[in-house]
Amino acid sequence: MSYNNTPEISVLLSTHNNENSINNSIKSIINQSFEDFELLIMNDASDDTTLKELKNFDDKRIKIFNNRSNLGLTKSLNLLLSKSSGKYIARQDADDISLKDRFTIQKKYIKKNNLKFCSARARSMHSNKKIPGVSFYIPEKVLFKYKNPHIHGTLFMEKKILEEVGGYDENFYFAQDFKLYCDLIKKNIKLARINKILYLMNTKDNISNKNKDEQRYYFECAKNNILPKVN
């Protein structure tokens, strides 16, 4: 199989000490039915065997980068964005799984509905429980009603709209995805959500579950358009 030098989709994945889950996460991407993509992976200073696991993959679409120190998700995603070449940006978390037709469905949905952004529904890989959320595009008044109506790992958008807002706001170590949604809404970008499960989430080890207080604080800062205080 030969691939274009300029892929249609750039997939951004940052990992820190995900040795037990990174293999399945990557496999779920390289086995997508839509094959014209690049998978950009940032090893964010892992001190377990994550890097070793990454090097086991022999796929020309995979590009591995390394941070010398742990920069966190927000800065790592911006670094990957700067190295991306696709028309579209897709997200993937290191401990989650994308279903086989995810990219095919999301790309078709965006083009059919003349959109620039969409997310998808997800299910917990541990309990078969659907992750709650809402459907179709989400106006500001609804966005602020929910804690976070879009699942970060399911994002699929035109690269140019992410660049237009300056990428992820690096003032937000947590809730960087919600801050992004706020920034996009200010640019009058419709935030659509496909009412279909395309993603499996690791709800046991999810960072949002481990850092609930920090997530809530940064969420409120984004919601109220104020900068978070950093200790």
Where would I find each of the regions flagged by the language model?
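Acidic helix N-cap motif at the loop->helix transition within catalytic regions
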Residues: 20-23, 48-56, 97, 101
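Conserved nucleotide-sugar donor-binding catalytic segment
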Residues: 82, 139-222
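Conserved donor NDP-sugar-binding/catalytic core segment of glycosyltransferases
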Residues: 101-132
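Short, acidic, metal-binding catalytic loop of nucleotide-sugar glycosyltransferases
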Residues: 27-36
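Glycine-rich, basic loop-to-helix element that forms the pyrophosphate-binding segment
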Residues: 67-84, 105
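A conserved acidic beta->alpha catalytic loop
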Residues: 43-52, 69, 93
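Short aromatic/hydrophobic "clamp" motif used to bind/position activated sugar donors
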Residues: 89
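Acidic donor-diphosphate engagement hotspot in glycosyltransferases and nucleotidyltransferases
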Residues: 49-50, 77, 98-103, 128-129, ...
